[in-house]
């Protein structure tokens, strides 16, 4: 059987993993096997949480819009439904920003939605 010399390749592969594990505590940043496990777990969690972040922000925006719209006597679903009927093209992120940072502008948006209801 022929001899396979892969010292550089193996070392580079291990160093790549150890570089990714920089900042981990204890053996998780020093020993290849534990570092490899932790890097794989970290990458898996990062992949999952990039998707989860989108869901979490949407929930936050909806909660903020709902709270602000109920101050004006409309529920969230009524507000969104009436805005769609009125052809107002504001997404949930922009509505939540208006509700928090510019309540006067949000009042005007709610007024448009309330007039559409009638």
Curated annotation (Swiss-Prot):
Pfam families xref list: Ribosomal_L20
Gene Ontology biological process terms in this record: ribosomal large subunit assembly; translation
Record bears the keyword Ribosomal protein: yes
Highest taxon of source: Bacteria
GO molecular function ontology, one term from the record: structural constituent of ribosome
Keyword terms: Ribonucleoprotein, Ribosomal protein, RNA-binding, rRNA-binding
Claim: rRNA-binding is one of the keywords in the record: yes
InterPro entries, sorted: Ribosomal_bL20 (IPR005813), RIBOSOMAL_L20_CS (IPR049946), Ribosomal_protein_bL20_C (IPR035566)
Cellular component aspect of the GO annotation: ribonucleoprotein complex; ribosome
CDD domains for the chain: Ribosomal_L20
Function: Binds directly to 23S ribosomal RNA and is necessary for the in vitro assembly process of the 50S ribosomal subunit. It is not involved in the protein synthesizing functions of that subunit.
HAMAP family: Ribosomal_bL20 (MF_00382)
Entry's family note: Belongs to the bacterial ribosomal protein bL20 family.
Name of the protein in its database record: Large ribosomal subunit protein bL20
Organism in which the protein naturally occurs: Cyanothece sp. (strain PCC 7425 / ATCC 29141)
